[in-house]
Amino acid sequence: MKIALLGASGRVGQAFLTQAAADERFDIFALIRSQHADLPLSKDRTVMGNARRLEDVKKIMENAEIVISCLGTDGDDTLSTAMAHILSVMEEQHIKRLITIGTAGILDSRYEPGKYRFETNESKRKQTRAAKEHAKVYEMLKESSLDWTIICPTYLPDGTATGVYRTERNVLPEGGTSISVGDTADFLYRELVTGEYVGNRVGLAY
């Protein structure tokens, strides 16, 4: 099964590749902006390019059955621009399954109905620009007919996978304050295998 991976050289992307590359069920191809010595992929499994460019997104997604995005916001509108390209190509190529990494800021507030966490005091972040960009992506996916999942980790320190953490649909697990990069990648791999959270944002924390 061919998987198109965008954001492979980021922290979660690299950790996911380390775990998933050994699974023979999946044939992973990654779009990368520059050669990256640490990626456990052969050169014929990587495409040099930029997720902001439609033609590069088309190239990596050719014949893919599942798309995974670990793209960050990059301080601009890269995330929403890339997602518009991804959705366009998925529709064109009849690809249904998309898993993407978001942020806990776009989960529902537990205490203020109708608001995202980043719009309330539940979020500790002072800057909301990145969360707004992630929210734009969520709104795009919500309006689509895709089988999507948005994984929404809270504070994301480096760390290896323990496999022990809490998940909750559309809200952050009560009292959750952090989740490691390794465990976020572990849950991404689990969701790839199980498809348990199709059509949901998933709050992720210890």
From Swiss-Prot:
Membrane-traversing stretches: none
SUPFAM superfamilies with a match to the protein in the record: NAD(P)-binding Rossmann-fold domains
Pfam families (alphabetical): NAD_binding_10 (PF13460)
Signal peptide coordinates: none
InterPro entries named among the record's database cross-references: NAD(P)-bd_dom, NAD(P)-bd_dom_sf, Polyketide_Oxido-like
GO molecular function: oxidoreductase activity, acting on the CH-NH group of donors, NAD or NADP as acceptor
Record protein name field: Uncharacterized protein YheG
Lineage summary: Bacteria, Bacillati, Bacillota, Bacilli, Bacillales
